[in-house]
């Protein structure tokens, strides 16, 4: 969060420092993996977004991040896959890719969530977000 905020405040050097701090921790003392981020501009923002995707992979941030960044129509379309990993009797592992679902993100309606009906009923001036019934 902080690295992204610093990027948007025009403090790219601070943003890079914090992304690299996270990468240093993830390296666990190794220097041959996860090189420091040196990019600037849009390339730096892409690195920050990727780092967020990796670091927060199982913490349910991605759904909201891709909407906040307005990139969902690029990354939330097409076939989504999972993987089954099974250990074989000889000790090796077998990796089998399987399709979970096809997705088709519809912008702009899918960028917004519906406003709860009870909130709309409380205020006649409140309008439902596009793509949802009133």
Residue ranges and their predicted role:
Residues 1-134:
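Acidic/polar-rich alpha-helix caps and helix-coil junctions
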């Amino acid at each position: 969060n902080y690295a992204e905020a610093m990027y948007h405040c025009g403090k790219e050097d601070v943003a890079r420092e914090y992304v690299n701090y996270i990468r240093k921790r993830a390296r666990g003392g190794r220097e041959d993996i996860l090189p420091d981020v040196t990019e600037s501009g849009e390339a730096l923002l892409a690195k920050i977004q990727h780092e967020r995707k990796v670091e927060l992979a199982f913490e349910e941030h991605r759904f909201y991040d891709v909407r906040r960044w307005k990139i969902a129509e690029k990354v939330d379309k097409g076939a989504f896959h999972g993987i089954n990993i099974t250990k074989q009797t000889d000790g090796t592992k077998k990796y089998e890719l399987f399709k979970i679902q096809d997705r088709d993100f519809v912008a702009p309606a899918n960028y917004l969530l519906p406003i709860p009906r009870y909130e709309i009923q409380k205020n006649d001036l409140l309008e439902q977000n596009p793509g949802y019934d009133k």
